[in-house]
A protein has these predicted regions:
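Hydrophobic ligand-binding cavity/cleft-lining segments
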Residues: 1-48
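Hydrophobic pocket/interface hotspot
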Residues: 18-22, 28, 52, 75, ...
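Hydrophobic-ligand binding "helix-grip"
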Residues: 34, 59-112, 118-120, 148
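Short coil-to-beta transition motif at edge beta-strands of beta-rich domains
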Residues: 46-58
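A conserved amphipathic terminal alpha-helix motif
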Residues: 112-153
């Protein structure tokens, strides 16, 4: 079974406008299609190991009775206007090390944006059997919200 989803979409905006939104905690909440991200605290990120807090609510997935909880988003890759990736540290210990990210490629019409979700680093087989937590359609929907958000600025 695949341990990675990748979805690509052309967004009619400059890479810098897209990347700026992706570096802000509020931007993550604004484009989330799962309904889990409720609010966030922290400053925009600008380097690997930068982090911020997201207040979550698992109710929207209706899969586990976790209720409200917080996660720390930790940046694992950062190339300005090109690539951002992060993992989360939440309630599970040790952390699972699943990754989310965006790669941006400038085009004549805007930016080709690839969103990905990678759970290949998860080593706990019992937990790994529950992956993916976010479906591929969720990434596609989030890209749609991202497009709407930056194209209408």
């Amino acid at each position: 079974m695949a341990e990675l989803f990748e979805i690509t979409r052309l967004i009619y905006a400059e890479p810098s406008a897209i990347f700026e939104l992706l570096t802000t905690p509020e931007g993550h909440v604004a484009i989330d299609s799962s309904g889990m991200l409720q609010s966030a605290e922290g400053s925009p990120v600008s380097a690997v190991d930068d982090e911020f807090v997201v207040h979550m609510d698992r109710e929207s997935l209706n899969d586990l009775p976790m209720g409200k909880y917080d996660v720390r988003v930790i940046i694992t890759a950062f190339e300005k206007d090109r690539w951002i990736e992060w993992t989360i540290i939440g309630t599970v210990r040790p952390p699972l090390d699943h990754r989310y990210g965006y790669r941006l490629e400038p085009t004549d019409d805007g930016t080709l944006v690839t969103s990905y979700y990678d759970w290949s680093r998860v080593t706990n087989e019992d937990i790994k059997g529950r992956f993916p937590i976010i479906p591929e359609a969720g990434l596609r929907a989030t890209l749609g919200i991202l497009a709407r958000t930056v194209e209408n600025r």
